[in-house]
A protein has these predicted regions:
Chain A
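Sec-dependent signal peptide recognition
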Residues: 2-10
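Phosphate-group recognition and catalysis centered on beta-loop-alpha active-site segments
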Residues: 19-415
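C-terminal motif of bacterial Sec signal peptides marking the signal peptidase cleavage site
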Residues: 14-17
Length: 415, 249
């Protein structure tokens, strides 16, 4: 009998113990990277590198064409198949060195990448800002933790088109910039993710807002505290059951970060990033609209004082949230994003209409919104073929996605 | 923004009850009468023996699945209902059918087996073709999925008088996968290797001719059909454990 009990107990343990998800490690160039001896590029030099590039060698993995786009901290390369590069860049004299990693956002593929731009192949032009050279980037990439040993060569084809460069198109990343399930090095809905997401091509973020037992709005997606999003700890059940002091003291996100309050997150976004759109996705926060909108108003004033051109909208995903907003005095002047019908948008004078992408392009309704001075976004679109169609055939002002680098690719390659 | 249904486990509080049932049932079964002529071969269903010609047998039960946390998020959990059928044919052949459902996602499979035995060891090989149909038209969604799959499979088994052990492996190929949302084709994929599964099954007499099947299966797959409504774009293999409790009717 004991043997049988042990037998079934072991099976039980196997069943519940074999589902360990992983994080994809970021390959590092190591302490001997040449970048330690280089100098940073100027802003004008960085702009000269932005553009559409042809992949001469390496197209089997990265496609035949990529875009290079500088963000606040890094040079990002986006492919049309969900792969992207995050590169550190520096110069020595007129030679430009790029070192970093590539990652496949749809799977766990990753590897080191090391490239350079020689003096005569665009380096001099980039550093001096004069002359006409076609930029050629030569280098190699690796797979996993191996050293880069496979050839990767890129040739600049053109600058971004006026349509792509001049239009204010919002590339909104889900969960403050990326999901934990995307196996990024930082946790979703954390300050670290807000600081990280620009490397993925994001220009704005969606964050999930909940309210503590003592009325403090904070960022967290799931309905309960769980090991998908947090480290094992003493608290369990709905996060809203706890006070902010309890959450702050006892809960750490899956990569060790603290859960941020909404105010911390918005302050960080305004002060420390170039993100220009924040969508506050209200998660079961019945009756808390006044609290959230007062923080929103204060943060918009803070942004204005800093000279930051940023949109912060409170989300209206349900009729319950719509009614909550209507209960706030002066609700028609509160910047909001309504996921419901265009009539609901008009009823609360939302700044943004955001239908689910599966409802179609709806170009006529989008145009109506534009004519009324509103923006139109759609959510949450992840398949490359649909991202391409919505960018090339649609009139939306932006897309909410889990794969901002794919949206960036299709947006910046528009002719 | 993703209020979706996925399969999951029944409440964990029920698991000890199942385990208790199996353990106590096993204990009772071992006290069977010495004159008892019971042979597990005849009523077993997962065991790869040659099924009796023109015989038909049905088992029904529940599958409890633990989808990976990458996919699960806030999904509502429900066990899958499973009905398994065997129909004996001449020349060591049999036909096996299987229905699995969580209402919004359903798989129907059918395939032949050919089996051999040597003393207490048995072996069979088969090929199942499955069709999945899923539909979710609640809470503002209008999503559908249709999938054709192939499951070439091998089983080996060893039997005692009242107990049979079966190890079964199958490869999983997706022939065609079509998912639509709001009338838009979200994805169409064809002809890809999707992974494999390895399952262990214990068939145990509880009393008289009543047999219980306990199964533990690891689905190592990229696309796990019951989770179609998540429209995942991940191109990763996941270990998806599946616990089954079935009763041969």
């Amino acid at each position: 009998m004991k043997i049988k009990i042990t037998y079934f107990a072991l099976l039980f343990l196997v069943f519940y113990g074999c589902n360990k998800d992983t994080t994809v490690p970021i390959p590092m160039a190591g302490p001997n990277s040449i970048l330690g001896d280089t100098y940073p590029l100027t802003s004008s030099a960085k702009l000269l590198m932005d553009g559409v590039y042809k992949v001469n060698d390496g197209s089997g993995l990265f496609g035949s064409q990529v875009i290079l786009k500088w963000n606040r901290t890094h040079l990002s390369i986006a492919c049309n198949n969900g792969k992207y590069f995050v590169m550190d860049v520096g110069r020595l004299d007129s030679v430009i060195f790029l070192q970093g990693y590539w990652r496949d956002g749809y799977s766990d593929g990753t590897g080191l990448a090391s490239m350079h731009i020689a003096r005569g192949e665009g380096g001099t032009m980039i550093v001096s800002g004069t002359g006409q050279q076609t930029i050629v980037i030569r280098g190699a990439y690796g797979q996993g933790s191996t050293l880069p040993d496979q050839v990767l060569n890129l040739t600049r084809l053109r600058s971004f088109s006026t349509k792509a460069a001049a239009s204010k198109f919002y590339i909104l990343a889900h969960r403050s910039g990326g999901r934990t399930s995307d196996r990024l090095p930082v946790s979703e809905n954390s300050l670290a993710m807000i600081g990280f997401t620009e490397r993925l091509g994001s220009t704005g973020i969606e964050v999930d807002v909940r309210i503590t037992k003592d009325g403090i709005p904070f960022l967290y997606h799931d309905g309960d505290l769980n090991i998908r999003l947090t480290e094992k700890g003493p608290l369990a059940g709905p996060a809203e059951n706890y006070t902010w002091a309890q959450l702050s003291a006892f809960v750490r996100l899956i990569h060790g970060e603290k859960i941020p309050t909404l105010e911390e997150a918005l302050t960080y976004t305004i002060d420390s990033t170039l993100l220009n759109f924040v969508y506050l996705d209200m998660k079961e926060t019945s009756g808390a609209m006044a609290t959230v909108t007062s923080i929103q108003e204060r943060m918009l004033q803070h942004a204005a004082a800093k000279g930051r051109d940023i949109i912060i909208v409170v989300g209206i995903p349900t009729t319950g949230a719509l009614n909550d907003l209507k209960s706030v005095p002066g609700y028609q002047s509160i910047p909001s994003l309504c996921e419901l019908t265009v009539d609901d948008v008009r009823a609360v004078n939302s700044m943004v209409w955001a239908p689910r992408w599966t409802l179609g392009l709806q170009n006529d309704l989008v145009q109506q919104m534009h004519d009324e001075g509103r923006l139109a976004l759609c959510w949450t679109i992840d398949q490359p073929n649909w991202i391409e169609e919505y960018i090339t055939q649609g009139h939306f002002n932006g897309l909410l996605t889990n794969f901002p680098y794919v949206v960036a690719y299709y947006h910046y390659t528009q002719q | 923004m993703k209020p979706l249904f996925t399969p999951g486990s029944i409440p964990k509080s029920l698991l000890p009850m199942f385990i208790f049932l199996v353990v106590t049932g096993t204990s009772v079964a071992q006290k069977a009468d010495a004159a008892d002529t019971f042979d597990i071969t005849a009523p077993s269903m997962r065991f790869p023996h040659q099924y009796r010609q023109w015989g038909f047998q049905v088992a029904a039960g529940l599958l409890m699945v633990k989808p990976p946390m990458d996919l699960l998020e806030n999904a509502i959990q429900a066990p899958l209902v499973n009905i398994h059928m065997t129909f004996g044919l001449p020349w060591r052949l049999s036909l096996e059918g299987d229905v699995q459902t969580i209402v919004v996602s359903n798989q129907f499979s059918l395939g032949p087996r050919i089996g051999y035995g040597y003393r207490n060891f048995y072996f069979n090989a088969g090929w199942d073709v499955a069709w999945v149909y899923g539909q979710l038209r609640q809470i503002g969604f209008d999503n559908r999925a249709k999938v054709w799959l192939h499951y070439p499979n091998l089983s080996v088994g060893y039997k005692l008088k009242r107990m049979a052990f079966t190890l079964r492996g199958e490869a999983v190929f997706v022939a065609k996968l079509t998912e639509t949302s709001g009338g838009n084709e979200v994805s169409v994929s064809r002809n890809f290797y999707n992974g494999f599964t390895v399952g262990f099954y214990l068939e145990q007499r509880l009393w008289k001719n009543h047999v219980f099947i306990f199964g533990l299966k690891d689905n190592y797959e990229k696309y796990y059909w019951p989770t179609w409504m998540l429209f995942t774009t991940f191109n990763r293999y996941y270990h998806i454990p599946e616990l089954s409790f079935m009763w041969i009717l």
